[in-house]
């Protein structure tokens, strides 16, 4: 997969693509990244990319001309273009899976008051929000989405690891433990040391349901509606409800 990131500050995402699992995916050729500095397409000697908002109001807006040229430089018309904005559709694991099936994604990172609506109308396929809060940087929001997407691509992370993570099957992840067995008087649950795979599976499923019920009960209803809720899970849920 190819990621094109259009930004005024390429140094922000640059470090991410050179770090940890992402760096290995790039080295293997599974992922490619192209950081596009919008200022390279500005017209004046100051490389200006923003101006006042028509109709008044605080803040500045990114100019449409440099951004349009930047988008054309990555052949955006033939790719899926994502604009990260607080007013967009909420990002979730389902969208991450959908995006991971694309051959290329283009991210438009806004600053200040955002971007001209005409750019959105002309180029953008998806307006996406990473949460109900406002950030000063579209770059950070774009990296949240990229991180959730690239790890779902074949060859980046093992399938077993992905299957047991939070939101797999709409359940949150179970608690995990490592050495030592006793830490400040707290023991690792005995079942995890037993080597009995079926009992470990049951314990982990129970803990996933317990945590989801406590923290994100809405996900249980989603699992039911999508046909991903098993009889075993329903039995465990009833036990919690009867306690």
From Swiss-Prot:
One Gene Ontology cellular component annotation held by this UniProt entry: cytosol
Cell compartments where the protein resides: Cytoplasm
Keyword Transmembrane helix attributed: no
Reactions catalysed, as given in the entry: guanosine(37) in tRNA + S-adenosyl-L-methionine = N(1)-methylguanosine(37) in tRNA + S-adenosyl-L-homocysteine + H(+)
Keyword Transferase listed: yes
Family that this chain belongs to: Belongs to the RNA methyltransferase TrmD family.
InterPro entries in alphabetical order: Alpha/beta_knot_MTases, tRNA_m1G_MeTrfase_C_sf, tRNA_m1G_MeTrfase_TrmD, tRNA_m1G_MTases_N, tRNA_MeTrfase_TRMD/TRM10
Matches recorded under Pfam families: tRNA_m1G_MT
First-listed, main subcellular location of the protein, grouped into a coarse class: cytoplasm
Residues annotated as binding S-adenosyl-L-methionine: 110, 130-135
Subunit structure: Homodimer.
GO biological process: tRNA N1-guanine methylation
Organism: Treponema denticola (strain ATCC 35405 / DSM 14222 / CIP 103919 / JCM 8153 / KCTC 15104)
Protein name, per record: tRNA (guanine-N(1)-)-methyltransferase
Annotated EC: 2.1.1.228
Domain of life where this protein originates: Bacteria
Any one Gene Ontology molecular-function term assigned to this protein's record: tRNA (guanine(37)-N1)-methyltransferase activity
Function: Specifically methylates guanosine-37 in various tRNAs.
Sorted UniProt keywords: Cytoplasm, Methyltransferase, S-adenosyl-L-methionine, Transferase, tRNA processing
């Amino acid at each position: 997969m190819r990621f094109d990131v259009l930004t005024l500050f390429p140094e922000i995402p640059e470090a991410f693509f050179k770090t940890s699992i992402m760096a290995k995916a790039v080295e293997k050729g599974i992922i490619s990244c192209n950081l596009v500095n919008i200022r390279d397409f500005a017209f004046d000697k100051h490389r200006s990319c923003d101006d006042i908002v028509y109709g008044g109001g605080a803040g500045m807006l990114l100019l449409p001309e440099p951004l349009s040229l930047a988008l054309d430089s990555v052949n955006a018309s033939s790719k899926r273009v994502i604009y990260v904005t607080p007013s967009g559709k909420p990002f979730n694991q389902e969208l991450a899976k959908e995006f991971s099936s694309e051959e290329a994604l283009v991210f438009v990172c806004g600053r200040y008051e955002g971007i001209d609506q005409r750019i959105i109308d002309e180029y953008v396929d998806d307006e996406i929000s990473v949460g109900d809060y406002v950030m000063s940087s579209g770059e950070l929001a774009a990296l949240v989405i990229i991180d959730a997407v690239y790890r779902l691509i074949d060859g980046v992370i093992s399938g077993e690891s992905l299957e047991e993570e939070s939101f797999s099957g709409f359940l949150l992840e179970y608690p995990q433990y490592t050495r030592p067995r006793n830490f400040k008087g707290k023991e690792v649950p005995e079942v995890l040391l037993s080597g009995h795979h079926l009992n470990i599976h049951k314990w982990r499923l129970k803990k996933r349901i317990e945590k989801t019920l406590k923290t994100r009960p809405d996900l249980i209803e989603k699992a039911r509606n999508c046909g991903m809720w098993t009889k075993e899970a329903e039995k465990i849920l009833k036990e919690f409800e009867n306690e």
